[in-house]
Amino acid sequence: MSANGTGDGASAALRQSAARRKFWGWGLEGEGLAAGEIGQLGAVFTERLGIDSVRAQEPPRVEELDLHAPRLVPPASLELVFSTDPYDRAAHTYGRSFRDLVRAFRRDYAHAPDLVAFPRGEDELVSVLDWCCDTGVAAIPFGGGSSVVGGVEPDVGDGYRGVVSVDLRHLAGVLEVDGTSRAARIAAGTLGPALEAQLKPHGLTLRHFPQSFEWSTLGGWIATRSGGHYATLHTHIDEFVESVRVVTPRG
């Protein structure tokens, strides 16, 4: 890791913790254009594109969604790890591509996960994966949900009894810093701003800033071999990785 100065990730990390994320798109609930601004933007489209009118569509609300009933019942030992809350299930249905946004605005949540797991440590994560393997359930890791290629979408076909989205938000943080070698041990569920904010007191930065930086995680970057700003040559995420400890369904 570079010892160069960092941007102010602390303010973004604080902002992220202060409100709930939109389940259907980027950002936090309450953020976005006001009704008047949307009207002005529609007028610009009408004038520039030569179309008769533009109709603004309201974003979906959780209570409007027709989610299928969960097909799975978690074991009593993991009951506190799993959620069937409609917001949680909706928020783990799509990534953030334009196709995902269109389907969300159409209120199409036919493939919502049956359960969302929020493991609070490695032991619980292992238990979740063991249960999924033993019961024929698909497990999909979920970091920031910023995928634009369907990576987090729980559409797995008919070969499984159901789908669990495994949210890694609690497996987060800079766990250890070695100032001499300028290396750090960082949990997979750490969002970009939090990662930078926790490295900054050590005079370090990962210097990896994909467009999804604010709402994507280190684990997701590594899994997808992420690139981004400053990634012209030797600054893709795999250039920064010395070793990885991974929990898989096989150990």
Q: PLM features: residue spans?
A:
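Noncatalytic alpha-helical scaffold of FAD-dependent oxidoreductases
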Residues: 1-250
